[in-house]
């Protein structure tokens, strides 16, 4: 039975997901339904957490909009997610960057990762 479930989940995995790490800045385009219309909405932020669970994988993006911190969790393989683009690679030494929630301004900056 579990082989059938694994096979179905394998078929639903997206193949065009770029590799990214915590600290990277991503732009995620998501389909948003407003009434009877569908449109793409872009969300650009820093990856503060990644949860790798196969089909149930997710990542958390954080950005500051009008002085207010906004965090959004995206399911990596969701059909609502249209595209994921890596804008900038960040150099960090932790897997979870929850400490950025308490920081603002220059102390919340992340160095750029150079090279590979």
Curated annotation (Swiss-Prot):
GO cellular component, one term: cytosolic large ribosomal subunit
Pfam annotation, one family: Ribosomal_L19
Keyword flag Ribosomal protein: yes
HAMAP family tied to this protein: Ribosomal_bL19 (MF_00402)
Function: This protein is located at the 30S-50S ribosomal subunit interface and may play a role in the structure and function of the aminoacyl-tRNA binding site.
Organism: Haemophilus influenzae (strain ATCC 51907 / DSM 11121 / KW20 / Rd)
Gene3D superfamilies linked to this entry: 2.30.30.790
Cross-referenced InterPro entries: Ribosomal_bL19, Ribosomal_bL19_CS, Ribosomal_bL19_sf, Translation_prot_SH3-like_sf
Descriptive protein name: Large ribosomal subunit protein bL19
Gene name as annotated: rplS
Residue ranges crossing the lipid bilayer per the database entry: none
One GO molecular-function entry: structural constituent of ribosome
A biological process term (GO) from this entry: translation
Domain of life: Bacteria
Keyword annotations from UniProtKB, A to Z: Ribonucleoprotein, Ribosomal protein
Similarity comment: Belongs to the bacterial ribosomal protein bL19 family.
Keyword Magnesium: no
């Amino acid at each position: 039975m579990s082989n059938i479930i694994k096979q179905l989940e394998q078929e639903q995995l997206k193949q065009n997901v770029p590799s990214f790490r915590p600290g990277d800045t991503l732009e995620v385009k998501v389909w948003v339904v407003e009434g009877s219309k569908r449109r793409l909405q872009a969300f650009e932020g820093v990856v503060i957490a990644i949860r790798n669970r196969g089909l149930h994988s997710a990542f958390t993006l954080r950005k500051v909009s009008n002085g207010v911190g906004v965090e959004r969790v995206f399911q990596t393989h969701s059909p609502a997610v249209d595209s994921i683009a890596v804008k900038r690679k960040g150099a960090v030494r932790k897997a979870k960057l929850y400490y950025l929630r308490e920081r603002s301004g220059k102390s919340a900056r992340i160095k750029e990762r150079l090279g590979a």
